[in-house]
Amino acid sequence: MICLRRRSDGLPVVWVEAVMIIGFYYTYTATRAVADGSVPAALAVGWDLVRIQADLHLNAERGLNHWLQGIPVLAVASCYYYATLHFIVTPAVLVWLYRKRPGHYLRARWTILCATVISLVGFILLPTAPPRLLPGAGFVDTMASFHDWGWWGGGSSAAPRGLAGLANQFAAMPSLHCAWALWCGWCVARFARHRWVRTLAVIYPGTTAFVVMATANHYVLDVVAGWVALGLGALLTAAVTRVAHRRGRRDGRADPVDQRAGPQRAGQQAQPAAIVGTAAAHPPASTNIHRTRPGPTRCM
């Protein structure tokens, strides 16, 4: 893997991460131009998914959608969940890994980036209309129904009012919400110290899957495809890590992706030398016991 600049502990500096994230955002925005010219194809794919899921007895979205519409409090909470956590939890986990678990940051970051690239390719090659945009399919657009309760507009999913043009309405396959949620849950469940935090991490991916389907933003197969995209991203990152590790050993340098052997192991390797140097400079007092004579005993 290529890093333009690194800190002394092997992590890329913050500005490199910021440039990368901004670049991916504009790449996602560019997919809208491709999707806008494929509305009939996107609707056709949506209907195909409905028929395929019916044959597989996987059409759970409509029932969840109608059930959620009957509970306004839960529907509004689901709208806020969909419109916020996707954009808050994922960056928060990235920052937490960068600051608190630096030895695992690079591999985790490359995993989610690879999964995002795979998803972007899916958006371009297979524009898919979400259930809420299928006319006559019996779905209710939950976000539009409760748009007065939030900042999102009635004509878009989670985009703020007046900014619907920035959202790709036909980026349903795969579900990036579910891919990112599973990544967050896996990272936090694996590396967090507190049990209650790990419990929330385990619940988060499943809750996200429920929300995206109940609000009629994704199909069951979208959710599965999002999880598969994350799995492929993890496999690709692992493969590149192994190749980079072999090259690093051959060239006599550290693995540029897997930085778990960074400052901590370096400190562990340097510790014996430090102990030897300290022992040489300050020999233990026990070596001079035979040279000292006991002083006079004073009784008080």
Where are these regions (language model features)?
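N-terminal transmembrane-helix/juxtamembrane module of multi-pass inner/ER membrane proteins
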Residues: C3-I88, G295
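Alpha-helical transmembrane segments of integral membrane proteins
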Residues: P12, V16, M20, L106-T111, ...
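Alpha-helical transmembrane spans of integral membrane proteins, capturing the lipid-embedded, hydrophobic core
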Residues: E17-T29, F87, P91, I112, ...
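Aromatic-anchored segments of alpha-helical transmembrane domains
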Residues: Y26-A30, T116-I124, I203-A214
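Membrane-interface loops
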Residues: V39-D48, Y98-V197, T241-R260, P272, ...
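Hydrophobic alpha-helical transmembrane segments
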Residues: Y80-L94, L176-G185
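Interfacial helix-loop-helix junctions of multi-pass membrane proteins
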Residues: P127-A137, N168-A172, G206-G233
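Hydrophobic alpha-helical segments of polytopic membrane proteins
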Residues: T199, A209, V228-A244
